[in-house]
A protein has these predicted regions:
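Charge-rich, low-complexity N-terminal segments
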Residues: 1-40
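Solvent-exposed loop and beta-edge segments used for protein-protein assembly and interaction
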Residues: 2, 6, 53-55, 102
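Generic "edge-of-domain/loop-turn" microfeature
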Residues: 11, 19, 68-70, 100, ...
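Surface-exposed, low-hydrophobicity interaction/linker segments
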Residues: 30-97
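Mixed-charge, glycine-accented linear interaction segment located at domain edges/termini
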Residues: 100-141
Length: 141
């Protein structure tokens, strides 16, 4: 998770960057030397903040696809750029004014007109949100 903001009677802001100095060298290596905290670790904390009798005023979660999953997703894709040109794939989940929006984002370190990666990412997110099995043809967009 890149970041989170939850607004109830107060504002909670979470920076998802792992603080390496919190861990011993061994612990950090056991975790796989992550730059960002996993959503599954923050999910129960966010749930505790959100749950209650009142709906939050708003919340926003910015999730970044893990590097391993990004590699798996881009394997076999014919892109006009390299894996190193990809800054990240993001899912922004925003609840505000009683509406929930899920917005995908793609960060590239170069300019390109090739929208293949964006289409594949949009399709993957749609499949995940629908709760269906992963389509074997997801990379064939």
């Amino acid at each position: 998770m890149q970041e989170a903001e939850i607004v109830t009677d107060i504002v909670f802001k979470i920076d998802g960057h792992v603080q390496k100095s919190f861990y011993s060298e061994e612990e950090y290596e056991e975790l796989g030397c992550p730059l960002l905290i996993k959503w599954k670790k923050l999910r129960p904390i966010c749930y505790e903040i959100i749950k209650g009798k009142r709906t939050p005023v708003k919340f926003r979660f910015v999730l970044k696809l893990a590097e391993e999953e990004l590699q798996e997703m881009t394997d076999g894709l014919e892109l006009g750029f390299t894996r190193q040109d990809i800054g990240g794939l993001y899912l922004n989940i925003v609840f505000e004014n009683g509406k929930l929006n899920c917005i995908t984002g793609t960060s590239l370190n170069i300019f390109t007109m090739d929208k293949t990666l964006e289409r594949v990412w949009d399709k993957r997110v749609a499949i995940e949100l629908e709760g269906t099995e992963k389509d074997e043809n997801i990379n064939k967009v």
